[in-house]
Amino acid sequence: MRTGWATPRRPAGLLMLLFWFFDLAEPSGRAANDPFTIVHGNTGKCIKPVYGWIVADDCDETEDKLWKWVSQHRLFHLHSQKCLGLDITKSVNELRMFSCDSSAMLWWKCEHHSLYGAARYRLALKDGHGTAISNASDVWKKGGSEESLCDQPYHEIYTRDGNSYGRPCEFPFLIDGTWHHDCILDEDHSGPWCATTLNYEYDRKWGICLKPENGCEDNWEKNEQFGSCYQFNTQTALSWKEAYVSCQNQGADLLSINSAAELTYLKEKEGIAKIFWIGLNQLYSARGWEWSDHKPLNFLNWDPDRPSAPTIGGSSCARMDAESGLWQSFSCEAQLPYVCRKPLNNTVELTDVWTYSDTRCDAGWLPNNGFCYLLVNESNSWDKAHAKCKAFSSDLISIHSLADVEVVVTKLHNEDIKEEVWIGLKNINIPTLFQWSDGTEVTLTYWDENEPNVPYNKTPNCVSYLGELGQWKVQSCEEKLKYVCKRKGEKLNDASSDKMCPPDEGWKRHGETCYKIYEDEVPFGTNCNLTITSRFEQEYLNDLMKKYDKSLRKYFWTGLRDVDSCGEYNWATVGGRRRAVTFSNWNFLEPASPGGCVAMSTGKSVGKWEVKDCRSFKALSICKKMSGPLGPEEASPKPDDPCPEGWQSFPASLSCYKVFHAERIVRKRNWEEAERFCQALGAHLSSFSHVDEIKEFLHFLTDQFSGQHWLWIGLNKRSPDLQGSWQWSDRTPVSTIIMPNEFQQDYDIRDCAAVKVFHRPWRRGWHFYDDREFIYLRPFACDTKLEWVCQIPKGRTPKTPDWYNPDRAGIHGPPLIIEGSEYWFVADLHLNYEEAVLYCASNHSFLATITSFVGLKAIKNKIANISGDGQKWWIRISEWPIDDHFTYSRYPWHRFPVTFGEECLYMSAKTWLIDLGKPTDCSTKLPFICEKYNVSSLEKYSPDSAAKVQCSEQWIPFQNKCFLKIKPVSLTFSQASDTCHSYGGTLPSVLSQIEQDFITSLLPDMEATLWIGLRWTAYEKINKWTDNRELTYSNFHPLLVSGRLRIPENFFEEESRYHCALILNLQKSPFTGTWNFTSCSERHFVSLCQKYSEVKSRQTLQNASETVKYLNNLYKIIPKTLTWHSAKRECLKSNMQLVSITDPYQQAFLSVQALLHNSSLWIGLFSQDDELNFGWSDGKRLHFSRWAETNGQLEDCVVLDTDGFWKTVDCNDNQPGAICYYSGNETEKEVKPVDSVKCPSPVLNTPWIPFQNCCYNFIITKNRHMATTQDEVHTKCQKLNPKSHILSIRDEKENNFVLEQLLYFNYMASWVMLGITYRNKSLMWFDKTPLSYTHWRAGRPTIKNEKFLAGLSTDGFWDIQTFKVIEEAVYFHQHSILACKIEMVDYKEEYNTTLPQFMPYEDGIYSVIQKKVTWYEALNMCSQSGGHLASVHNQNGQLFLEDIVKRDGFPLWVGLSSHDGSESSFEWSDGSTFDYIPWKGQTSPGNCVLLDPKGTWKHEKCNSVKDGAICYKPTKSKKLSRLTYSSRCPAAKENGSRWIQYKGHCYKSDQALHSFSEAKKLCSKHDHSATIVSIKDEDENKFVSRLMRENNNITMRVWLGLSQHSVDQSWSWLDGSEVTFVKWENKSKSGVGRCSMLIASNETWKKVECEHGFGRVVCKVPLGPDYTAIAIIVATLSILVLMGGLIWFLFQRHRLHLAGFSSVRYAQGVNEDEIMLPSFHD
């Protein structure tokens, strides 16, 4: 680590301290990764491998004895190219050499100079051979030193370019059979490179190594104007600390920006990331913002929307937006690009700001080293204060070094040290630039917490300091404050400047103290014992030591020593008095060991403290003499001072503590959040100065908890100022070795410390147990979420923020909070047992139960304090035993529940053991204890809310519920709810994670979306399920797609005004089981109902040793206590493996198993590198995970806990069981990918990443959003490479690859832009190739213009965003990454085959309906064009259809359906024979079939809407039989089909499908005498069958009017005719049921249930009378009558003519009919 305080850099004449110069002089490379020999401390022999086994040999530097620490805590042997490991599956000879990618345990750690590995086996030497023994005490050292093997930990080497986004190297890595333990150089890469994953042969992940280099070549860009070199790591994604370490490893630092000109340069820089880390941070406890390279922070450009003042949940790191130039505070753990910076010229002139100079000033002014200071006690605004100083021929004070800060803090404020005082720093600019009023250059800034906090766009801004610490704060210039004036004084003769010091030569004065260097190297204490009391004194001493060349590496003794070898360092006695340790300045990895003496280093680590051997080590000395008496020490609290209400302490402590554990807080927090939480209360995270203090603290904590808990404490090394050394957040100096050797692991990135509390009551009684195990501290990544403890000095009153709800005493005093329960002690009211129960119940609590030793001890101590040892208190009999999981107690009683029926129970502090073992008189009047469960996590069901039924056979029991899987039906929410009500249940409510897991385990054969019982309006808070249970658990999809969509409302449809929840079944997606919401009026599936049971299910495994099968895997639960390593061995005995969990269904099923066993169970997940990376022990890759949010990854092995989450546990802990498995679906070993493509060189800091035969460039640079249209984006890609184009995705593998890249930048973007355009009325890629593969979230888009954006989201689905709502489109655009792609192989011929409108194949012309339709709608659309839905009858036909679907890119309906109610009897809708099954194995439920682009044939509900269908039109017309129509048949209804005559009957068919009851009604509608067809003989059977085949539609199933009587079991026709002919299928296929159907395809009959299934209908009616013959007779008679009448008329006329004309005219009679003759048409 590089070294440097926040010391100033000065212009010519005012320059930096020497150690800063040394740091700049050369890159700070790490030597920790160099090879070494391993020396056995007892024998002095070195170890080496011989034929894979370890032997001892004489030490030398030959390669066969050289080892090296590599990634994941492995020891790599250079000569054999293997790693030292343990095969714990064998009982003997576990220790040997393994291939470094072996599944054996290869990690090693140090402890007190010993080396241990898996299962706590320790490396030992026995008879000259290496072995592993659990109780070994062998000491191991690095050759040529006294260092432990772990004293110099492995340091990561970070990368750039490549395809790893800055990830560190993974050493060793394997290429072509050779293991490489360092970066390598070859002609295929632009510089030394390394692999970044263990399995390079498969992953192909690599990057260019970032190592120290002199000058600014290769990876750097020079800028003469600013005298700097810049490294733009654009295509990387690291946390702030990782980025800082990466820069430091190269002798550089994270970017600091010191002027508007430099800011402009960065904004105008091409190829810079849009968002990237800068060195600005507030990581040093109790200090403000500062640059990591310690340059002054006087130029600012904060984003007003992300202010610099963090809140409780705020952030202490800063990033820059390159487009706006604005700085934003941001979570330090976010993964972002970064910029490093280092100076062009390392030569710096040095100046001395600490040399004493005697100065003369006017009366009242304070002289100091050439200047005079005046603190003016009147208050004025800044401008008036400035004017007053000018009137004194001076100026407001300017501060340029820590020497100036010391004057302010130690000399100007003797009384009121907390007063605020103006200094001469002021800003009048935008962006902010603070400048000194006296015109001197700003070389130091010293900001207070959360400062500088400059109001946005408001000037001027002025600065004050606080006298106590001298730290600065931005104020309104109108504030009235005191001020300090400063002017030059008269320097006196230098010869007399040290007149207060002894006359001997060499004494130097600093303040009121004199110092002298003795240049002879002597053992500790020979000359004097130096005490160092402050940072300022340390800086002065650094100045004294600066002349010693760092190459000589001199040391100077201090007076700090661990006299008792207990690890506690104190100042040696001086003048009979021992000063308290008030300041510490430890070096990297110090204090290293107990019993030593402390010396200060020179060189690059000037002034840093290191532990040395007091006798053998020799160093120079600095002696110190005070010119006056020792000053008084700061007053500290007294042990008997009180603690605030709700805070606790222990007798010897000077502090009060408050534990914030999971049951009492909203959430666990990372270290920074926890520290800010404490600060808001006026406290800090806990700190300690003495070993005994932390012991007592941990004993205190064990009374608060059972089990194991990690709690944040104030120890951290977050700030770059600390250079890798530890500090307490409340400024308590570090004087005690409380950090075990494991603190050295992954030292660069584990910057915060936590303490482990684990309850081991049996050990408290034994004096000889090892305290070091009890005091267990560990470093963690600071973003880990843990519980914490706040600490405040005794006697101080904490603050009470608005959001904080402090503990307050009730009417019975303050409660006792233990393990999530509140205990109230009712001492002033004595009641009998029953009265006590009722009293507690009336106050919303219960009579207390005792279920753990922690609770027992806390209650015992509490009642002893309240009422003495003998007073008895009522408690309640526990249903469960005390600590029933605890198996190590000395007493047997705890193993069994106390069961005395209705007997009563009390206890006292003195005789509690006897009291808990016997009943007593329930009428006795006693005080009592009430218990209230914490509702956040321990709420229990109210006993009166359970349903009054138990689970019947069809219902699946789980806990207090029954679940029923029903046939999926697509319904609205209310219909779905009614459906479950009809079964006597409700839609499921999900009340816990374990219930969620159980439901998820039922999902594999269910639909993609299922209703659950959650319903609410958009204007109300969701708080209850439809079964009236409280909403205590939720599992909404984290992306919550519907949250971005508007759910339409229909004013006339009440359901649409409500939102209802769905559970998502996304197959193997990690989001399977999560919830979404939609309009309640939409149709989704109901497949699962629930009801409550009176009796909670006591599901247990009848025989725990038997295997259980789920999906394709066999599982075995081992129900016995064992460690992780033992569990692995047990599984191997059964030829099984510790389980690897790779999908959400498997996870859910095993979570339920863990609950049923009520045990945490080992799984095969473990880490070899202190939780940085986890992998499965069977070698499978970790794709799916279920980490507990509250656990953090704190240990190396993993259990599946009873709550369904993964939690890390010490591998050597005993757990109550393990899960073994045997996979029945073992896939082939992962095939090594071959990337033969060579990509172009990086462009503008952005590398091209190879995948398959393409190269990709993911653009996260600034101004990437300036390209808004597809053409502009394409132009941007063309500038990168003429062959590139905007991203297209051809298949699922490529989709997954692009998703993987996007997830690296999930802090910056939510989508990758897709190059999809709208041309020629269809969507296509920008290169005009069709979308042969798609993954749209909502199916086929309905886009009809170019006004849209498309992107791949962080869950892998494609989203489309139109420009209808411009704000959403802008958000989509600004949160997208642009991606360019070069296809190194011409894919156009392969992918440019646009799907034709018509496609001939065999005897048909095929086409695709490209719109969303149901199966029935698709059938109708095909029929309207004279065609059918597609059918397939051989493999070639299947391949043809699959090719159509693949080219279309969407799932399409085909003509296959089943309508017999069983979803198993499928038919082609075109009437062709179902003679070829295109799918294999089981498929999803559903009665219609579609084909998806992956070639999968899926069963779906026919009324579900899909993305289209395949139609075909026959090219050959079908030869049809001649049909006979007769007028003796009933007339056809309007627009209806005609009746067909066959023999003596008329027949009419219908194209629709009907149930049996519908069929009967339909026939009577056609004609009142018509019935469902009856068949009397074989000819009629053939006629009806032929009629159906020639008029095929959907199915060949035809209802017959034949039914069976329930009484005599006889069969009869509906038309009443006798059954004279039947044609049943053979008995094995004829079916069961009381109704019948004709199967027209094979002309046989089948018995079916009348209520199930659908079929075609043929109606039958007898032939009517022959009306034509009758009409002919009538007509003939009419003609004869007419002819007779005519003859009579002619006769009469002739008679009159003969007789002469008559006077009487013919008149028609009123009763004569007119007869009309109808015309006849044959």
Swiss-Prot record:
Location, primary (coarse class): membrane
Sequence positions bearing Phosphotyrosine: 933
Pfam name, any one: CysR_MRC2_N
CC terms in the record's Gene Ontology section: external side of plasma membrane; extracellular exosome; plasma membrane
All ranges on the Cytoplasmic side of the membrane: 1692-1722
Gene name of the record: LY75
TM region positions: 1667-1691
Protein name from the UniProt record: Lymphocyte antigen 75
Species: Homo sapiens
A single MF term (Gene Ontology): signaling receptor activity
Glycosylated residues (UniProt): 135, 345, 377, 529, 843, 865, 934, 1076, 1103, 1225, 1320, 1392, 1593, 1626
Fibronectin type-II domain location: 164-211
Location(s), subcellular: Membrane
Cysteine pairings via disulfide bonds: 169-194, 183-209, 247-340, 317-332, 389-485, 462-477, 597-614, 840-930, 904-922, 1060-1080, 1197-1211, 1488-1502, 1635-1650
Lineage of origin: Eukaryota, Metazoa, Chordata, Craniata, Vertebrata
Occurrences of domain C-type lectin (ranges): 225-341, 368-486, 493-625, 652-778, 818-931, 958-1091, 1110-1222, 1251-1374, 1401-1513, 1542-1661
CDD domains noted in UniProt: beta-trefoil_Ricin_LY75 (cd23411), CLECT (cd00037), FN2 (cd00062)
SUPFAM superfamilies for the chain: C-type lectin-like (SSF56436), Kringle-like (SSF57440), Ricin B-like lectins (SSF50370)
Signal peptide: 1-27
Domain Ricin B-type lectin: 33-156
UniProt PTM comment: N-glycosylated.
Physiological role: Acts as an endocytic receptor to direct captured antigens from the extracellular space to a specialized antigen-processing compartment. Causes reduced proliferation of B-lymphocytes.
GO biological process entries: endocytosis; immune response; inflammatory response
Tissue specificity comment: Expressed in spleen, thymus, colon and peripheral blood lymphocytes. Detected in myeloid and B-lymphoid cell lines. Isoform 2 and isoform 3 are expressed in malignant Hodgkin lymphoma cells called Hodgkin and Reed-Sternberg (HRS) cells.
Membrane-side (Extracellular) residue stretches: 28-1666
Record keywords: Disulfide bond, Endocytosis, Glycoprotein, Lectin, Membrane, Phosphoprotein, Receptor, Repeat, Signal, Transmembrane, Transmembrane helix
Bilayer topology: Single-pass type I membrane protein
Something else known: Isoform 2 and isoform 3 are produced in HRS cells by a transcriptional control mechanism which cotranscribe an mRNA containing LY75 and CD302 prior to generating the intergenically spliced mRNA to produce LY75/CD302 fusion proteins.
